Amino acid sequence: MSEPNILLARVDNRLIHGQVATQWVSYLDANCIIVVNDDAATNRMRQGLMGMAAPADVKVVYLSVKQAIEEKASFEEGDKALLLVETPADALALVEGGVKIERLNVGIMHMKDGKHQVSATVAVDDDDVAALKALRDKGVELELRRVPSVPPEDVEKLFA
């Protein structure tokens, strides 16, 4: 058992869906998707739906934030992982808990009350901005990009 090789961490409200399964997994050559979300870790129906979108040859692991921090050494040698979180706050909790995240892709954060749109697929509120700033201050490289086939957008949009 060893720590997973996290190729990329991604904030995506939908967690596993078509874009993640077909584009990001292929682009990264990932063989493992780690979904870190307190609800998804225990919600079998949600896991089943996400599992249908995942490629058959890719291992999918569902963990709560606490489990991800405590069990970060419970992965197999050779795991090349795409780590998915629903919010920047979850990514920050992982980093503060000792999970090594070098690069965070901010992909899809849906618009809802209290948020403002900063790109076509990302809306943030004050809590999101604070977590993203803290991640950047901790040395995490931030990337604003929906899919790998398009160039990254200016990350400063996240803080406007």
Regions flagged by a language model, labelled:
Residues A9-N13, V61, S119-T121:
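Short, flexible loop segments at the rims of nucleotide/cofactor-binding pockets, characterized by
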Residues A41-N43, A68-I69, D90-A91, M111-G114:
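Short gly/pro/ser/thr-enriched loop/turn and capping motifs at secondary-structure boundaries
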Residues S2-A54:
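Long, hydrophobic N-terminal alpha-helical segment
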Residues N13-H17, L63, D127:
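Short secondary-structure boundary/capping elements
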Residues N5-A9, N31-I34, V58-V61, K80-L83, ...:
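Structural motif
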Residues G97, E102-A160:
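Glycine-rich, aromatic-bearing surface loops/beta-hairpins
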Residues G51-A53, D79, V122:
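Short, hinge-like loop/turn segments at secondary-structure boundaries
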Residues V61-G107:
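Ordered, amphipathic secondary-structure segments that act as subunit-interaction surfaces
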